[in-house]
């Protein structure tokens, strides 16, 4: 639960809310699996069985109307084979969620983006209209192995 204290001319008002948000981008889970815009602030998959999903769709704006298009479209920018991990968690006291890794290209449609993913884990059940938070962790670029010299001295017990 969330508690807010507000100072007003009449005194202090306490507001207790049982609605809590999940961390990250505030969106709504959509159960429709079609490759078409489902409306503002929605995130959805291309398969009803999330462990079989290979594409996540993100509307170009999150729940408050802020544009996330450039951010989502950058998920395939790192050069690592798995460029990011996406955590989608339902808001509330007993949340459900799903974890995917970005494994391929991001394609920008006119009002939403398509992200190629591989399923990692699911806990609980996300249902249509659930308020969810979307958290993304980038993996970074692959490092270059240049000027690497193998030194076996410590393993062989030799003293230089």
Regions found by a protein language model. Give the residues of each.
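Hydrophobic residues positioned within well-ordered beta-strands of beta-sheet architectures
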Residues: 25, 84-86, 100, 115, ...
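Short beta-strand-centered aromatic/proline hotspots
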Residues: 97-106
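Subunit-assembly interface segments of extracellular/virion macromolecular structures
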Residues: 92-95
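Short, solvent-exposed secondary-structure boundary/capping segments
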Residues: 106-120
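Glycine-rich, low-complexity segments
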Residues: 2-66, 121-160
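Histidine (H) residue identity feature
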Residues: 47, 73-77, 119
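Short coil-to-beta transition motif at edge beta-strands of beta-rich domains
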Residues: 69-90
């Amino acid at each position: 639960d969330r508690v807010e204290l507000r100072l007003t001319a009449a005194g202090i008002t306490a507001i207790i809310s049982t609605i809590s948000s999940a961390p990250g981008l505030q969106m709504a889970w959509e159960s429709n699996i079609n490759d078409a815009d489902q409306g503002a602030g929605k995130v959805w998959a291309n398969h009803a069985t999330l462990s079989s999903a290979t594409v996540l769709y993100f509307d170009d704006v999150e729940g408050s109307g802020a544009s996330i298009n450039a951010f989502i479209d950058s998920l395939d920018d790192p050069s690592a084979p798995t460029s990011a991990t996406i955590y989608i968690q339902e808001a509330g006291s007993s949340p459900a969620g799903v974890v995917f890794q970005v494994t391929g290209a991001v394609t920008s449609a006119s009002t939403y983006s398509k992200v190629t993913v591989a399923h990692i884990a699911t806990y609980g059940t996300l249902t249509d209209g659930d308020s969810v938070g979307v958290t993304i962790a980038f993996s970074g670029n692959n490092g270059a192995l240049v000027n690497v010299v193998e030194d076996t001295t410590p393993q062989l017990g030799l003293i230089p």
